[in-house]
């Protein structure tokens, strides 16, 4: 198939607007290419409203910000009504406060228009939200391809765990088909992602949401760091064997702990998805 007949659009990470055209003219380049396609319903005003760029249509690229230029590039790729849309870090220069709104609207417009889209991003949250499937590529190799839920909760390798950087791998011993033991946390129950012989020495993945705060618990560890993330805190706890374990707590929780305080972990510990390596 000749390039001009492939009906593929691409939005680059860098500003790819023509400097001698206004934003509007940049967006409308190629807009008539697929005007006869009846099964697509993306229109100019819908895209302008989606990306909130009506006030910059008559400006030139050197007169707008990097985030505005990136939104204009994204608009240009959408206006062609492609069968396949390729997006390279499409929202990397967009302010976080506006980014989530664009993601929500973009997801709706891609779904309603039935545009197949491949997005390259280093933002795992963006990939999980926008993608029906996620591929983790490391060192030019596809390590895992699955739906977002499984990529997060059931990573298939230590490499994927390290890439997502959401939890910690701790040493443990399998004590039954549904339990294992860790020196600091004690007994942990749940459903294994794959069977291990009893007595196996494994590395257990502990995600921030796997452990629960309980001030009344006798299992307490020292808080060495606390990160405020708006709706939640991520505490880093230090165990007697010097493990650094992340724990998620809602920010509206009645009592927040400071560094060097003791933080209680609720018992018994149950993890729905026990992932071991």
What is each of the regions a protein language model found here?
Residues 167, 178-277:
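Non-catalytic connector elements of ABC transporters
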Residues 7-9, 22-159:
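ABC ATPase nucleotide-binding domains
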Residues 152-175, 205:
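C-terminal boundary and immediately downstream tail of ABC-type ATPase nucleotide-binding domains
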Residues 17, 153, 228:
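Nucleotide-sugar-dependent glycosyltransferase donor-binding/catalytic pocket residues
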Residues 1-7:
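ABC ATPase NBD Q-loop/coupling interface
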Residues 13-18, 123:
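Catalytic "switch" loops of ABC-type ATPases
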């Amino acid at each position: 198939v000749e390039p001009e007949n492939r009906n593929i659009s691409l939005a680059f990470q860098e500003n790819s607007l023509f400097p001698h055209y206004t934003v509007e003219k940049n967006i409308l380049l190629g807009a008539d290419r697929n005007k006869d396609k009846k099964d697509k319903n993306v229109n100019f005003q819908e895209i302008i409203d989606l990306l909130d760029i009506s006030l910059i249509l008559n400006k030139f690229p050197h007169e707008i910000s990097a985030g505005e230029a990136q939104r204009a590039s994204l608009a240009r790729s959408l206006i062609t009504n492609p069968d396949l849309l390729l997006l390279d870090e499409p929202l990397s220069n967009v302010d976080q406060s506006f980014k989530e709104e664009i993601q929500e609207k973009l997801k709706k417009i891609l779904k309603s228009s039935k545009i197949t889209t491949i997005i390259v991003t280093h933002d795992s949250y963006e990939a999980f939200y926008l993608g029906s499937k996620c591929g983790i590529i490391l060192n030019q190799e596809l390590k895992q391809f699955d739906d977002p839920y499984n990529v997060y909760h059931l990573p298939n390798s230590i490499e994927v765990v390290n890439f997502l950087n959401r939890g910690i791998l701790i040493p443990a011993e399998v004590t039954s088909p549904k339990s294992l033991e860790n020196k600091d946390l004690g007994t942990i129950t749940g459903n294994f992602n794959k069977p291990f012989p009893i007595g196996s020495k494994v590395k257990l993945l502990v995600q921030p949401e796997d452990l629960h705060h309980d001030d009344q618990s006798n299992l307490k560890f020292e808080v060495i760091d606390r990160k405020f993330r708006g709706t939640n805190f991520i505490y880093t706890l230090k165990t007697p064997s010097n493990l650094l374990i992340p724990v998620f707590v809602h920010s509206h929780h009645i009592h927040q702990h400071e560094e060097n305080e003791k933080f209680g972990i609720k018992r018994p510990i149950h993890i729905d998805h026990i992932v071991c390596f």
